[in-house]
Design a protein with these regions (language model features):
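Conserved structural core of kinase catalytic domains
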Residues: 67-117
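Catalytic-loop of the protein kinase fold
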Residues: 125, 129-146
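Activation segment/activation loop of eukaryotic-type protein kinase catalytic domains
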Residues: 141-182
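C-terminal lobe helix-coil module of Hanks-type protein kinase domains
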Residues: 182, 190-263
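Surface-exposed loop/turn elements that mediate protein-protein interactions on large endomembrane-trafficking
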Residues: 302-321, 340-357, 377-395, 412-432, ...
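Repeated scaffold domains used in trafficking and secretory/extracellular systems
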Residues: 320-330, 356-369, 392-407, 427-442, ...
Length: 592
């Protein structure tokens, strides 16, 4: 694709792609980002009207905004002079949604660091509001966190200013006062709606739960609880096990949150929040109270029993840590890596690294070996703390491309998928854009370019990729996960479309046939056992059945609710039990 900037013609290719959403693609070019809108069909009258409003916004975009607002620096045009998009500063980092993921945060990003991020974001919002600019669609996918810089606001071209509306708002961050309101006609957002979204993000990042998350006996969904102003600060809302209790927060923070979520107070975040100081108790709990609320309630010598029973569910603690679980796999038994006291060790206590993981580093388990990938794509195979092999893999926007099983390790080299064990080329993929997973017998991956998804299946130890034409989606890719048994694969993809998170799932046979698919499902990791599907949710384990090619929700095993959440990884065992890998523990669940 050719675009024209002030410097002349620029060619953008798939290898330069940084990200893709429902509205545009973003490319890397000479240290800057070029956002190119998707083409609109001449027959699409609504789409052409929306694009016209977008171009008007670009022409009237305010100048002199804070450098943390990644607005247009110049326009990108076609050879005829038509506006195709714009150029903005390129920033490398993670979206703010990662701050609400406990497996990502624990041991790496403290609550004090989170407080600093949001203190700086509050300053940016105050400046914007003073200039008459409202973010509108403020959500954790539009905020980029990059070290001590920022945070940065992206998608600035959708902001509300100069009488031009912000046409969309993400439902998880949208002020309930705007539910059911047409956002596209006139300006509907105001500074108060930004502060509501800000409060949702801060609360979720401190406590790992949405303020209207959890489960409630009568108000069954997050949106219904938001409409009723019934937050997790109420005692009748059951928190997911991944969440930290709101009782870890200071009174000043709780007072503001209650006002925002339950009384429609829309005041800016008070400065007292940024003086919140967290401490970590010897029990591992991070809190901002004079005394640890967990130890105060249970007593300093209280311990959690190794076996817990609720109804039909028995939960056995296989491993607990005051550090964090880094990664886990089911490979002839449960294998995992723990980071504790600044050291990484395997499940048998053997050394992996005598230091913490750096930002951008990832681990993958391959039998007795542990593969470490770094932010530049460098790979090392570690055994007992020693490097026994080195390699290199490609980098995608989500990180280094690497997948491993007991006897299989896969990486990429330019446009090729490589079997690291044999050195053979398995098949062609898209350089820098491929997602990849492998089980013991089957592997799965996909790449996207130009709004088109190419998914593929392969068998470990063999060459050749089987394309999966029945797998595809639209919208911005938020996350993806795959699970396997000996003859099946389950792909779960979450996208953001028109302000909603949509969960898609495909159950695949070993030949690549789509046995069933489901769309708009519950969030949560999936697991497979002989073709049977179960997902972990904040309400407990939920089985999925197949009906006429559709994945349909079956039984919700509510007795499992205290032991599993949507953020936990599920690893099935051959005896029918399920291993749940949390942020700081590994549990074995059995149903009688």
């Amino acid at each position: 694709m050719d675009v024209y900037l002030s410097s002349g013609r620029v060619r953008l290719g798939d290898a330069d792609l940084v990200g893709e959403g429902g509205e545009a693609r973003v490319f890397r070019h000479q240290g800057r980002a070029v956002k190119v809108f998707h083409p609109v069909s001449p027959q699409d009258a609504v789409g052409r009207a929306v694009r016209a409003k977008k171009l008007e916004k670009l022409s009237r975009f305010p100048t002199g905004l804070p450098p943390t607002v990644l607005g247009p620096q110049e326009l990108a045009r076609s050879a005829r002079g038509d506006v195709l998009g714009f150029v903005m500063r390129l920033v490398q980092g993670d979206d703010a949604g990662r701050l609400a993921q406990r497996r990502f945060r624990d041991g790496r990003v403290s609550n004090d660091a989170v407080t600093g991020v949001f203190a700086r974001l509050s300053q940016t919002l105050a400046v914007l509001h003073g200039r008459g600019v409202v973010v509108g669609d403020l959500n954790d996918g539009n905020v980029l966190v990059s070290g001590d810089e920022g945070p940065f606001l992206i998608d600035a071209d959708s902001m509300q200013f100069d009488g031009l509306p912000c046409a969309v708002g993400h439902e998880r961050f949208l002020d309930p006062r705007l539910y059911g309101v047409d956002l596209s006609t006139v300006p509907r957002f105001d500074p108060g709606t930004d502060w509501f979204a800000f409060a949702v993000m801060l609360f979720s990042s401190w406590l790992y739960v949405h303020p209207f998350g959890g489960t409630h006996a009568k108000l069954g969904t997050l949106l219904r609880r938001a409409e009723a102003r019934h937050s997790v600060l109420r005692d009748d809302v059951v928190l997911p096990r991944v969440a930290a209790s709101w009782k870890t927060l200071p009174d000043e923070a709780l007072h503001w949150f209650r006002g925002v979520f339950e009384a429609d107070v829309r005041s800016p975040a008070p400065d007292v929040l940024w003086r919140t100081a967290f401490t970590t108790c010897r029990c591992g709990l991070e809190h901002a109270r004079p005394a640890c609320p967990a130890c105060h309630a249970l007593g300093p010598l209280a311990t959690r029993p190794a076996v817990r029973v609720k109804g039909r569910c028995t939960a056995r603690v296989l491993r607990q840590t005051t550090g964090r679980m880094v990664t886990a796999a089911m490979q002839g038994g449960v294998r995992f890596v723990i980071e504790e006291d600044g050291v990484l060790r395997r499940e048998d206590g053997s050394l992996v690294l005598e230091r913490r993981l750096d930002a951008g580093e990832r681990l993958a388990i391959a039998g007795a070996s542990t593969w470490l990938s770094d932010a530049r794509g460098g790979l090392v195979r570690l055994e007992n703390g020693r490097v026994v092999e080195r390699a290199q893999t490609g980098l995608a926007p989500h990180g280094p491309i690497l997948a491993a099983a007991t006897q299989a390790v896969y990486r990429t080299e330019h446009e090729w998928l490589i079997d690291q064990v044999t050195g053979a080329r398995v098949g062609q993929v898209l350089e820098g854009q491929t997602w990849l997973w492998t089980g013991e017998r089957l592997g799965l991956g996909f790449y996207r370019a130009g709004g088109v998804t190419v998914a593929f299946l392969f068998k470990t130890g063999r060459a050749g990729l089987k394309q999966l034409p029945g797998v595809g989606w639209s919208g911005r890719l938020v996350s993806a996960h795959a699970a396997f048994d000996a003859r099946h694969a389950l792909l779960t993809v979450t996208t953001e479309t028109s302000g909603r998170d949509v969960v898609h799932r495909w159950l695949l046979s070993e030949t690549g046939e789509v046995l069933a698919a489901g769309h708009d499902g519950r969030a949560g990791h999936g697991a497979l056992l002989q073709g049977r599907v179960v997902i972990g949710t904040d309400a407990g384990l939920v089985s999925l059945g197949v009906s006429s090619g559709v994945l349909v929700e079956g039984t919700c095993f509510t007795d499992t609710q205290p032991f599993v959440s949507a953020q936990d990884e599920l690893l099935p065992q051959s005896d029918g039990s399920l291993v749940v890998v949390g942020a700081r523990d590994v549990l074995q669940l059995s149903l009688s």
